[in-house]
Structure formats: C-alpha cells, structure tokens
C-alpha cells in the first residue's frame, strides 16, 4: 500500500470505513493519525500521517508471539489467528508502530489485515476504496507493472521507518 500524505486531507473516512467493515467499537481502530508540523514560520502547516499495521517482512510482533497466532500469508499479509491468540500483548509491546489493539469483546489482539477475510485476498481494502482524495494506492508490490509499483517509483515513496522492518506500506511525504 502507498499512502500519499500530500494528498491526505485528514477526513478520517479511511478509519471509519475500516471500523465499519471490521465491526469495531468506536474506541477501537486499526488506523491512527499523527499530526506533524511542517515548514517554518510563517508558512507552517500540519501534515496528517495515517498509521496502521505495516505488514512487515521482518515482523517483530510475529517473532515474539508464543502461540504463533501472528503469521504471514504467502502473499505477505500479516494476520492474526483468533483461535490461537491468548491476548498476552507481547505483540503489542513488540510492534514498533504501536498499531495493535486488544478487542474488548474477545480479548484477542488485532490489527489491520488489508481487509483479508477467510484466507482469501479480496478487493482493495475499505480504506483505499473510501479515500476521497485518492491518497491511498493498493496493489501487488512484486509486480513492477502494477499501479502501486509505478506510483512508488514516480513519487520516490519510502517506508515510514526506512527498512527497519521491511514495511509493505510506503509513504509519500
């Protein structure tokens, strides 16, 4: 996924769509926002940076899970097996992005799953489809001809923390 913070208007529609499709409570969210001051006086502005699971290639959350509830699919999506999760929160502590939450009703630790359900990749995630400014692009990072690969090359998008965890979410900032 690519998130272009220059296009993001901070409307939170992506977060609301995510909450609805995942049946999350209002206080539960897989997407959070950082407001970062940019520029110098008198040309100061706030950059809205949506933050969610980065679906890391080298996922610290997966490495610490004692029950192996956190796993990576063949296509690189990091998921949580709700049947195996014991709610110990080790993965929450290990995540360098602070994007995992505990679902109050079940005690399971969850996070963005790119709207992947029942083991099958579906349409683009709800956050992409609902973005009014076109700030999000989703696709196959391994296909150099995909829209996302072309957009990453065109904009020089980078993972938010460099290659610390080999994130699969790229940002234009």
Predicted regions mapped to residue ranges:
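Non-ligating segments of multi-cofactor redox enzymes
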Residues: 1-173
């Amino acid at each position: 996924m690519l998130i272009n913070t220059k296009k993001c208007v901070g409307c939170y529609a992506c977060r609301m769509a995510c909450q609805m499709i995942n049946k999350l409570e209002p206080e539960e969210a897989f997407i959070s926002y950082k407001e970062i001051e940019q520029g110098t006086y008198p040309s100061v502005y706030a950059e809205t940076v949506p933050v969610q699971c980065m679906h890391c290639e080298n996922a610290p959350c997966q490495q610490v899970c004692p029950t192996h509830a956190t796993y990576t699919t063949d296509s690189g999506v990091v998921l949580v097996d709700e049947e195996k999760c014991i709610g110990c929160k080790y993965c929450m502590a290990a995540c360098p992005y602070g994007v995992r939450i505990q679902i109050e009703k079940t005690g399971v630790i969850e996070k963005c799953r790119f709207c992947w359900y029942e083991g099958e990749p579906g349409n683009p995630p709800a956050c992409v489809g609902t973005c009014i400014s076109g700030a999000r692009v989703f696709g196959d990072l391994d296909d150099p001809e995909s829209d996302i690969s072309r957009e990453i090359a065109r904009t020089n998008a980078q993972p938010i923390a460099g290659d610390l965890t080999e994130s699969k979410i790229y940002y234009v900032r």
